[in-house]
Amino acid sequence: MQGTNRDGVGDRLKMSRKKEIRKVTIGETAVSLPGIIAVARHGAPVVLSEKAAFRRRMENSRRLLSQALEADVPVYGVTTGFGKSCGTLLSKKSLPQNGETLMRFHGCGTGDPLGIEETRAAMLCRLLCLARGYSAVSLPLLEQLAAFLNLGITPVIPSEGSVGASGDLTPLSYVLGAMAGEREVFYRGKRMPAAKALRLAKLKPYLFGPKEPLSMVNGTSVMTGIAAIVLDRAQHLIEAATSATALSVHALRGKAHHYHPAIGEAKSFPGQIDVAGRLREL
């Protein structure tokens, strides 16, 4: 007898039994939790979509920024300062240093590094966000971030120092720095300077264009990536707990009708209904 599936709870209970994801394509469709786990934990490759609509969207976003700069339109964080300094216009000579200043200013994280899984999940979430075409970043930036994931270059991100409210500014600044060949990364099982890892991987340090440093750090991708890892672990715990319960009931010669659908329907709790259905299956 099958359990009732409400709000996808039953689907989530069976997540661990779904077909393995071997590749994640960026820029076409939304990436679900299994896709994030496939990249973060299992090293599934990421590729940028070749579809014209995706590439046109990215180019149009970048072009809009260029047009604003050419017209001397003030652009926050590009031609102005950050935060309370948003009313301060910067000289054209100082524009290239603005992004570097942002990166170094936020390099104040503390604590042990985040795990490899959590960091890779955060990087993928940032890539997915930027690939939507609203942040005026270029395709080469996305390619560099994808290359880091595919080559196993993982920035060393301190686990403490972010409030997440307007963005995981501090932790994401470490991703920003690593892409530019600064700070440290984990690569080939070792912790090393990012510049050395880039040389070994035959990658060039990325030269960020206007606004790209701000676009990289001003998002909540780190907390999103960590949440994805935690949710996946919780799903596995639910599956394990449900299996253990079924085994215990069987050992004690319990009755399946104790988990009859009518009992769950009386309370209408989706989780209870789906766990009861899974117990009946087992």
Place the predicted regions along the sequence by residue.
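Conserved, well-structured ligand/cofactor-binding cores
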Residues: 12-282
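N-terminal amphipathic/basic-hydrophobic helices that include classical n-h-c signal peptides
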Residues: 1-14
